[in-house]
Amino acid sequence: MKRVTGIGGIFFKAADPKALGAWYRDHLGLDVSAWGGAIFPWGGPEGAPGMTIWCPFAQDTGYMAPSASPFMVNFRVADLDALLAALRAEGCQVLDKTETSEQGKFGWVMDPEG
């Protein structure tokens, strides 16, 4: 089974997300949107469109919960439901929820470091 096919997003906590976004815009040329992040569009498998999101969050965000880590990486996968089932069978910590939105379908897996 094909597992990870790419990176969908990089999300991290910052002391001042707006100022940090401005720094990345001004010094590295990121096209930081009004919502605080940047989108990197690309062509996906078989030419399907895809994107990678870069976005800082406030230090007190609950977005990465239940992880206490200051960052989260979203991976693109070929078949989310099959991968989550395989990871559960392998003894990995897989949260019991998935979400579907216009951005895609999401599941959460905690690596050994949380």
Regions found by a protein language model. Give the residues of each.
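A solvent-exposed interaction/effector surface
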Residues: 50-52, 57-64
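Core segments of cupin and vicinal oxygen chelate
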Residues: 1-5, 11-54, 89
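Vicinal oxygen chelate
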Residues: 1-15, 35, 60-114
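Short linear motifs in intrinsically disordered
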Residues: 28-31, 76, 96-99
